[in-house]
UniProtKB/Swiss-Prot annotation:
Record's keyword annotation contains Nucleotidyltransferase: yes
Recorded superkingdom: Archaea
Record-listed E.C. numbers: 2.7.7.6
One Pfam family in the UniProt entry: RNA_pol_Rpb1_5
A GO CC annotation given for this chain: DNA-directed RNA polymerase complex
Subcellular location: Cytoplasm
Sample GO molecular function, one term: DNA binding
Name listed for the protein in its UniProt record: DNA-directed RNA polymerase subunit Rpo1C
CDD domains: RNAP_A (cd06528)
Lineage of source species: Archaea, Methanobacteriati, Methanobacteriota, Methanomada group, Methanobacteria
């Protein structure tokens, strides 16, 4: 029993949700009674992690009661679904159990709900042989022809420029490492999201501030070849900056500087007009606070909570800031999401960004088509573009690669390497005039050779 408890604790920590001891013991009893094997135990822990997540905020005893009730409801739904000979994914069964709990459904009402869900689920399933890739390509590509080519301001934030429309969709499917307008939406936890003063302090800490932002006076003294800057204490307090930190930054950056209270006097490395002007420019632009790669920040009130929108992006650094909601805070830089949160998060970001880009143009595309594109882009564990430098350029078939772009180069390389094309795909069979193996889930008839 102790061995099972150890495994359950290990699996739950991997899922990111540590189950309380009473729940762990309850799961261990079920696993012991049903003699669950390793994969089944892992699936059971995932199920209870999801149930525990839905019942957050309860103490251990209340949580155990809630988890037991939810589990019994799921078992009841599973039994009814099995009796109707329906095959639902686990998530759908959990959703039905959740509706049953929320609306306190009777047995007859639950029976009717399962019947309706089954009808809708069967209608939504793809028939074997449907060319889902072709349909997805048409469904995403056709609305793309109606999208605008211009870059608009982000809705509601006139100060920030964000790429929208077709240019943004091209950025997403090309998996560009350097996007034209990276931006972040930073949310806050608990009651901090309603605290305007706290959010403004965070905005000043995250956003870029230069020495020029906190100066009262600035002048170039040509007579004695120096640059004189006077700090403004009011501006420093407004931006919630530390006076000593600013001076430390100045002393670290400039070797020839004299500090007398609020007056800073800088001297150029060489006593020339050109060096003096370069020094003046460098003094003004000296960054005294802010997160790397983030420029301007804008604070907005959205549904009673304060949200920070940024120009530029640094997800890793922002998530380390105190009070930042690590679940909702996001960036439109997909490669940054992949680096910080992993490939599954990057896949979700591709889906969300592509869907939002189309919806902003008033275009509706079924999310499953976009999901298929995202699946193809992230299938091998890294974000790849849809083009000759990504998916299309890495196809196993020589003819398929040659048919897309750079035909001569692909054919020449393949002939040097002595590659063989086994003609298993669609494009290569069209090229040589053979029947094409079209359709997801379609089968081939194979004859067994006589020995």
């Amino acid at each position: 029993m102790q061995d099972i408890i150890g495994k359950i604790e290990d699996y739950s920590s991997k899922n990111g949700i540590l189950l309380p001891d009473p729940v762990v013991e309850y799961v261990a009893r079920i696993a012991d009674e049903e003699k669950l094997k390793e994969p089944e135990l892992q699936e059971m822990v995932r199920l209870f992690s999801r149930i525990a997540e839905r019942n957050q905020g309860l103490d251990d005893d209340e949580l155990l009661d809630a988890v037991e009730d939810d589990y019994q409801r799921i078992l009841k739904v599973q039994e009814l679904v099995k009796r109707k000979r329906a095959r639902f994914p686990p998530k759908l069964i959990e959703d039905i159990a959740e509706v049953m709990k929320k609306h306190e459904l009777s047995d007859d009402e639950l029976d009717e709900l399962i019947r309706r869900v089954r009808r809708a689920y069967d209608r939504a399933r793809v028939e074997a042989g449907e060319a889902v890739g072709t349909v997805a390509a048409q469904s995403v590509g056709e609305p793309g022809t109606q999208m605008t080519m211009r870059t608009f301001h982000y809705a509601g934030v006139a100060e920030l420029n964000v790429t929208l429309g077709l240019p943004r969709l091209i950025e997403i499917v090309d998996a560009r490492k350097k996007i034209s307008t990276p931006t972040m939406s930073i949310y806050f936890e608990g009651d901090l999201r309603y605290d305007e003063e706290f959010v403004r302090r965070k905005a000043n800490k995250i956003g870029k501030s230069t020495l020029n932002d906190v100066l009262k006076n600035f002048s170039i003294q040509y007579a004695d070849m120096s640059v004189v800057a006077e700090l403004d204490e009011e501006k420093i307090q407004e931006k919630h900056l530390e006076y000593d930190e600013i001076l430390a930054k100045v002393e670290k950056t400039f070797k020839k500087v004299e500090i007398d209270n609020n007056i800073l006097r800088f001297e150029p490395p060489k006593p020339t007009i050109r060096e003096l002007r370069l020094l003046a420019d460098k003094v003004r632009k000296l960054q005294i606070s802010g997160v790397k790669n983030i420029g301007k920040v804008v604070i907005r009130k959205e549904d009673d909570e304060w949200v920070i929108h940024t120009e530029g992006s640094n997800l890793g650094a922002v998530l380390k800031e105190e009070g930042v909601d690590k679940v909702r805070t996001t960036t439109n830089d997909i490669h940054e999401i992949e680096t910080v949160l992993g490939i599954e998060a990057a896949r979700n970001a591709i889906i969300h960004e592509a869907k939002r880009t189309m919806e902003e143009q008033g275009l509706t595309v079924d999310i499953r088509h976009i999901m298929l594109v995202a699946d193809m882009m992230t299938a091998d564990g890294s974000v790849k573009s849809i083009g000759r430098h990504g998916i299309s350029g890495e196809k196993a078939s020589v003819l398929a690669r040659a048919s897309f772009e750079e035909t001569g180069k692909h054919l020449l390389r393949a002939s040097i390497r002595g590659e063989v094309d086994h003609l298993t795909g669609i494009i290569e069979n069209i090229i040589i005039g053979q029947p094409i193996p079209l359709g997801t889930g379609s089968v081939s008839v194979v004859m067994k050779e006589r020995k």
